[in-house]
């Protein structure tokens, strides 16, 4: 038997040998491809598990085609004290149920305006991932926090209000002594102190120190240490940059209705009905400081000579100019029709 097989191998022609070698090569290649596919399948299994474990925010960063802007809308109002913020926020509380959005107050320990590093991380995670609360309006007395530092795919929309710095300081001075009509029975920290603001300035007491005006600049500047150094030129420049680049809209207390109007036109998912409610309800001047006396001319001139007032007023004027610009661009040049835009010359047809 062996001799017959050997004889057959010897009698094979060269073409037969080539065919046999080719068949062997194809068979080996097939086995190698099958083995490689099995290895790849095992290698990709952990990756598929990793994909399944990705958070909603991580999925959102990889694909934004299915992102619903309206239903994921988050507005962050880091309200400066004594700028009329209570009046605005209470409209939100009145309309959150019919408009189907949530309002959340950010209450920081001891009324601190800057968050610790662990709390920054936790706050950013809460705002970004708390989908049950969206759409939402968060509000609280805290400095601007840059969400882009935390690799967040969809940052909240910042809004705020500013007020003439001396008016804000005078209002806060009397608020600490006499409170307001919002909670008239609450005893304030300086209750019983009857010294007027004018007298305080003459006596150079700490409660009317111009350094107390240094608040709107750091609120827009943010969480950097330099932001909270009274008189810092860097802080003022940073506050202006953030106001233009990071805030959707900054209004002024003296034009609250126009601020509400622009928000309702721009973000109706949350602010629908705010204009009418502000105009017709008693919420337009909800919190009025009691027993407030206007400062004298001499006091005003004295305060306006200080560097702090000049810098805070610089920011106020800057914000006012930007707000007036946004109001103006709402209308067409004839000032009678709302500005519109359209798409045209779309190719290919």
Swiss-Prot record:
Subcellular location per UniProt equals:
Golgi apparatus membrane
- SUPFAM superfamilies in the record: P-loop containing nucleoside triphosphate hydrolases (SSF52540)
Tell me which species this is from. Drosophila melanogaster (Fruit fly)
The top of its lineage is: Eukaryota, Metazoa, Ecdysozoa, Arthropoda, Hexapoda
- Where are the Cytoplasmic topological domains? 1-17
Task: State what protein this is by name.
Answer: Heparin sulfate O-sulfotransferase
Q: What does this protein do?
A: Catalyzes the transfer of sulfate to the C2-position of selected hexuronic acid residues within the maturing heparan sulfate (HS).
According to its UniProt record, which residues of this chain constitute the active site?
A: 139, 141
InterPro entries found in the cross-reference section: Heparan_SO4_2-O-STrfase, P-loop_NTPase, Sulfotransferase
Q: What's an example of a GO molecular-function annotation for this chain?
A: heparan sulfate 2-sulfotransferase activity
Among PANTHER family, the record links this protein to:
HEPARAN SULFATE 2-O-SULFOTRANSFERASE (PTHR12129), HEPARAN SULFATE 2-O-SULFOTRANSFERASE 1 (PTHR12129:SF17)
